[in-house]
């Protein structure tokens, strides 16, 4: 299995495992908000235009998330590009997703291969382009957020 699929599997399994631990702190039906950060390798950003990374994300990953949203597992997905570059933490794109609950993360990992097969009949092209997107990614990390009530 290529580097991307391995990384994706590890990320989803890792979130699923941590979901069991963190899920105990929240009710089962509480939405889960995760911020996914991407730092693009030098030369990968196109000033004033879309980056290759963004084009590949929109072509090969966003449709999968849209399908999960149609199925009710994801409540929202928003993509942000950093307007001003701070020194730390350095990131270029942030995706903020609100999942239905912790079990939605586990169900998504089960559904994903079937969704990829349905959306991308030429799996070799999809895998190659996702591999390229990850080659353009210098750093990636996720932050799982817990909302703190203000009242």
Regions found by a protein language model. Give the residues of each.
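Core hydrophobic alpha-helical transmembrane segments of single-pass membrane proteins
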Residues: 8-15
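Short S/T/G/P-rich N-terminal loop/turn motif that feeds into the first structured element of a domain
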Residues: 17-117, 131-151
